Amino acid sequence: MAKHLFTSESVSEGHPDKIADQISDAVLDAILEQDPKARVACETYVKTGMVMVGGEVTTSAWVDIEEITRETVREIGYVHSDMGFDANSCAVLNTIGKQSPDINQGVDKEDPKEQGAGDQGIMFGYATNETPILMPAPITYAHLLVKQQAEVRKSGKLDFLRPDAKSQVTFQYDQGKIVGIDAVVLSTQHSDSVTTADLREAVMEEIIKPVLPAEWLSKETKFFINPTGRFVIGGPMGDCGLTGRKIIVDTYGGAARHGGGAFSGKDPSKVDRSAAYAARYVAKNIVAAGMADRCEIQLSYAIGVADPTSIMIETFGTEKVSHDIIIESVRQHFDLRPYGLQEMLNLLQPIYKKTAAYGHFGREEFPWEATDKAEILRDFAGIK
């Protein structure tokens, strides 16, 4: 591919859909802390002055859904009624029921290693060596921008900022290599007291410049900071939020395919989540091993069946060893059955709330980001 542009977007922890994701995963974490084998599918809806938490849960644990919800909203920063959403006074509705026994009989087996997939579906994982964290640059820097927005807001450095924000970054590529940034969009909710001019200057100096490498910026780079001028009404007052509506933000920013399944609120028996994490783990280790510059993995499952129904590996012509060697290395060194990948990645632990904002991938604290299989794969492939 010759010269081209590629764009990815992200949203802040205060975006309505991300509030919903974080509540769903906070509930999941609280349950897993008491009952690691719980079955959880937690969905959240947020709108002005209210949160509704629903879904299906089978567990021996008891958790305070209302308090978990309020604490999550409080941590994000919605603590004043003038924002249209206040952790201390919003209504919290709990409509959680039990998981269907028809699903349980397919998932739970006498031999844990034969645990079936919780549903059918397709999942993708991806890695590229265009950044040190083996993630696409556009989504990486889009996440960093909104994360920086949250940091300067919470620290009080820019005390006129409010929790809701969105970013978008367009990168320029030439022959597959990054040559610069073409455009940056950052829209942030703010108080009524700040002028548009002051806000734009502050965002440029305190959010954009500290995050984006100067060598990728030029006088041709276009900046769009709050392009409509005013963004006072935001969060759930501006738009309702739902769990699972930011699946491209959660993954690779459109640089790789997506199977359609959301992550937040789902325990690891749900392969929508756990197999997508495993696919990232496999792809990242293949790239880290030097077997390819780019790698995309597709996995598919049937409900109640342990083994994947298919494994597909695409390296976009960047492979350094034969395709057959890459496929065989995956078959020999990764257990992609639901039980196997849970054990391989230690997924039955309360680590999910922090995944629910700023991306599930490219963050080294998560076990699926480890490259501990890279050396094994290098040896298998005969790479020196």
From Swiss-Prot:
Q: Where in the cell is it found?
A: Cytoplasm
What segment(s) does the record annotate as region Flexible loop?
Answer: 99-109
Gene3D superfamilies noted in UniProt: 3.30.300.10
> Which terms in the GO cellular component ontology are assigned?
cytoplasm
Enzyme Commission identifier(s): 2.5.1.6
**Cofactor(s) for this UniProt protein:** Mg(2+); K(+)
Tell me which residues bind ATP: 15, 164-166, 230-231, 239, 245-246, 262, 266
EC class (word)? transferase
Any Gene Ontology biological process? S-adenosylmethionine biosynthetic process
Q: Keyword set for this entry? A: ATP-binding, Cytoplasm, Magnesium, Metal-binding, Nucleotide-binding, One-carbon metabolism, Potassium, Transferase
Can you provide one Gene Ontology molecular function annotated for this UniProt record? methionine adenosyltransferase activity
Which residues does the record give as L-methionine binding sites? Answer: 56, 99, 239, 270
**Catalyzed chemical reaction(s):** L-methionine + ATP + H2O = S-adenosyl-L-methionine + phosphate + diphosphate
The pathway noted for it is: Amino-acid biosynthesis; S-adenosyl-L-methionine biosynthesis; S-adenosyl-L-methionine from L-methionine: step 1/1
Q: How is the cofactor bound?
A: Binds 2 divalent ions per subunit. Binds 1 potassium ion per subunit.
Write down the InterPro entries for this protein, in alphabetical order.
Answer: ADOMET_SYNTHASE_CS, S-AdoMet_synt_C, S-AdoMet_synt_central, S-AdoMet_synt_N, S-AdoMet_synthetase, S-AdoMet_synthetase_sfam
Residues that, per the record, bind Mg(2+): 17
- Residues that, per the record, bind K(+): 43
Give the NCBIfam families listed for this entry: metK
Quaternary organization: Homotetramer; dimer of dimers.
> What PANTHER family does this protein's entry cite?
S-ADENOSYLMETHIONINE SYNTHETASE
Family the UniProt entry places it in:
Belongs to the AdoMet synthase family.
* Protein function: Catalyzes the formation of S-adenosylmethionine (AdoMet) from methionine and ATP. The overall synthetic reaction is composed of two sequential steps, AdoMet formation and the subsequent tripolyphosphate hydrolysis which occurs prior to release of AdoMet from the enzyme.
Annotated protein name in UniProt = S-adenosylmethionine synthase
